[in-house]
């Protein structure tokens, strides 16, 4: 049965349009779009997009309440970034390459830290008045923003991330000491956790269940500088409204006082000490420069790389 002339004309036009060059061009464009995340300059776009959102779009000179609407401290709240694993970021085993974990962490942790600490890092967001630990200093104002620097990072890989797999990066402040603020991050399977951080379906808080959804766990530490002087994290936390100024407990602004657990300095200190148990092991790596053994160990070989 012969096809109508209009259909034959259409098929002929389509066939004439499809050429090897056009097929290759289309495949190349599709490949680039599929792997856009790993292309040169995209990391910078992702980073500055987060900075723009926190420092410009969400600019505010008034710190948010100490607790959220459910009475939980904002300091320990997670910041979540949804990601994917393009083929260009895979290694020869077709798993997410080790180095690319850190580029995702850069984006996620930067926005987390800017969300928490923009009131001391950005001139436009600095409060007009700054309170100190004893509640005084109402007429004070920070003259210039602080500088924040990363002082170390580590990552443990638990499960492979396959090509094009979707996942989420969850980061929060774990603890702080006299110098460092420690941030813990988790790569988790997309859809394993609800928006409020609870497990979905039959999952619970059992550590064995956690291991099934946690793909990687990471830790980093940050220091705040005023010129060359290190600023104690507790002071920074208080200026940003993340740590109580007085001993009395406080309740969430929108929550009923009778139904919300109180959080004061004692509760924050208890959580901090618990986090320092893990963070202290990370800081224990400070001794590594003393264990080089350069004068005692031989050299297997030397080669030039890019």
From Swiss-Prot:
It comes from the Eukaryota. Disruption phenotype: Does not alter the yield of aspercryptin significantly. Its EC number is 2.3.1.-. GO terms for molecular function: transferase activity. Induction: Expression is positively regulated by the aspercryptin cluser-specific transcription factor atnN. The keyword Cell inner membrane does not apply. Keywords: Transferase. Belongs to the lcsJ thioesterase family. Part of the gene cluster that mediates the biosynthesis of aspercryptins, linear lipopeptides built from six amino acids including 2 highly unusual and nonproteogenic amino acids, 2-amino-octanoic acid (2aoa) and 2-amino-dodecanol (2adol). The core structure of aspercryptins is as follows: Ser/Ala-Thr-Ile/Val-2aoa-Asn-2adol. The first step of aspercryptin biosynthesis is the generation of the fatty acid precursors, octanoic and dodecanoic acids, by the FAS subunits atnF and atnM. The fatty acid precursors are likely transformed into the corresponding alpha-amino fatty acids in three steps. PANTHER family: PROTEIN THEM6 (PTHR12475:SF4), PTHR12475. This is Probable thioesterase atnL. The lineage of its organism: Eukaryota, Fungi, Dikarya, Ascomycota, Pezizomycotina.
């Amino acid at each position: 049965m012969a096809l109508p002339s209009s259909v034959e004309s259409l098929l002929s036009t389509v066939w004439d349009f499809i050429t090897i060059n056009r097929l290759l061009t289309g495949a190349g464009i599709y490949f680039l779009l599929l792997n856009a995340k790993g292309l040169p300059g995209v990391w910078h776009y992702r980073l500055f997009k987060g900075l723009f959102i926190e420092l410009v779009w969400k600019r505010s000179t008034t710190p948010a309440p100490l607790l959220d609407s459910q009475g939980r401290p904002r300091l320990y709240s997670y910041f979540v970034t949804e990601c994917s694993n393009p083929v260009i970021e895979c290694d020869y085993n077709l798993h997410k390459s080790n180095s690319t974990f850190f580029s995702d962490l850069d984006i996620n942790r930067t926005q987390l830290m800017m969300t928490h600490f923009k009131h001391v890092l950005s001139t436009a967001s600095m409060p007009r008045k700054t309170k100190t630990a004893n509640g005084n200093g109402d007429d004070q104002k920070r003259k210039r923003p602080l500088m924040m620097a990363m002082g170390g990072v580590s990552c443990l890989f638990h499960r492979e991330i396959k090509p094009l797999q979707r996942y989420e990066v969850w980061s929060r402040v774990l603890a702080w000491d006299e110098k460092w603020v420690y941030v813990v991050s988790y790569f988790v399977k997309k859809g394993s956790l609800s928006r409020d951080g609870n497990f979905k379906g039959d999952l619970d808080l059992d550590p064995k269940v956690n291991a099934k959804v946690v793909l990687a766990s990471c830790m980093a530490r940050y220091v705040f500088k005023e010129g060359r002087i290190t600023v104690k994290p507790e002071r920074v936390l208080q200026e940003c409204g993340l740590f109580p100024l007085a001993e009395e407990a406080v309740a969430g602004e929108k929550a009923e006082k009778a139904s919300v657990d109180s959080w004061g300095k004692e509760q924050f200190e208890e959580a901090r000490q618990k986090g320092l148990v893990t963070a202290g092991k990370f800081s224990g790596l400070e001794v590594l420069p003393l264990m080089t053994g350069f004068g005692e160990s031989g050299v297997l070989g030397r080669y030039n790389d890019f």
